[in-house]
Amino acid sequence: MCGRTQPFDPRQQMKSQGYEIFHYKDSQLDNVAVHHHDFFEVYLFLSGNVDYSVEGCIYHMEGGDLLLISPQELHQLKVNAKETMYERIVLWIAPAYLSKISTAEASLTRCFDHSRPGHTNLLRPGKNRLGGLRGILSEMYQEFYGNEYGHEIAASGLLLRFMVELNRLALAQPVACPDQEDRSGGFIQQVLAYINDH
């Protein structure tokens, strides 16, 4: 999709003040510990055999699924088959940057808004819409790591376009949380409630 991939970087902090994009393709990856961070994350799952847990919901990932993860949301990757190639594109966006590029009429954080009726972390776009979103991400990735004249401006423009399309998709296609994680006897839900209250 993006032409080239990069080795998986386990860091969970942004180096940039704005946004970062990654294209990972690897096998023999272990489960990732439950974690959170202070930026927005958009995760496009391309291939593999994984589940993703976000705030107590377990999502059985299918190729083309998009996960929207807000700052401070607890999430975890669960690898079901280590020998299977696992490919994904990950976009990190600083909240201040996303607010800065939004307008009063169109907040680009809306797709992450938990208070919106029908909010979900998982989006499953149709084939045509997915193709468009993948194309935008591919171009953004090439520009972000490119060195041609104006590549930073081009990448930022593609980020704007991607976020507008992502918000349109989120507003048009709500999906309910597929599986509540109950293996902990409700402990995770209690911890999340405590964190949200404090």
What are these regions (language model features)?
Residues 1-66, 73, 105-121:
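Generic protein-terminus/edge-of-domain signal
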Residues 55-56, 79-81, 179:
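Short, solvent-exposed loop/turn segments at secondary-structure boundaries
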Residues 71-77:
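Short acidic (Asp/Glu) patches
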Residues 119-129, 144-157, 163-198:
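Short, Lys/Arg-enriched, Trp-marked, Pro/Gly-tolerant hinge/linker segments that flank
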